[in-house]
C-alpha cells in the first residue's frame, strides 16, 4: 500500500460512512501540480487524515474521473 502526503488540490470527493470495522472518510480525486507523468490520483482519505491510501495514478483527468466514479459505485454497492 502506497502512502502519499496530501498537499495537493482535491478536485472531487465523495464521503464514505463509517461501518463495522471501517472508518468514515472520503474517496478523493487529487491533482498533483508538481507531477508531470501521472498528475491525477484517486484514493481514499480517512476523516482527519493527511495522507491518502490505495492511490491509483493517471496521466489524464478523463481516466482518473472514470476511476473515481467506479470507486464511488463500488463503495455504494458495499453499503
Where on the chain are the PLM-derived regions?
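Short aromatic-glycine-(Arg/Gly/Cys) micro-motifs in beta-strand/loop hairpins
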Residues: 26-55, 71
Amino acid at each position: 500500500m502506497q502512502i502519499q502526503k496530501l498537499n495537493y488540490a482535491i478536485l472531487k470527493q465523495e464521503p464514505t460512512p463509517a461501518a463495522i470495522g471501517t472508518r468514515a472518510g472520503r474517496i478523493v480525486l487529487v491533482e498533483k501540480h508538481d507531477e508531470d507523468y501521472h498528475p491525477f490520483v484517486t484514493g481514499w482519505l480517512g476523516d482527519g487524515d493527511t495522507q491518502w491510501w490505495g492511490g491509483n495514478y493517471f496521466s489524464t483527468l478523463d481516466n482518473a474521473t472514470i476511476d473515481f466514479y467506479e470507486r464511488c459505485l463500488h463503495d455504494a454497492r458495499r453499503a
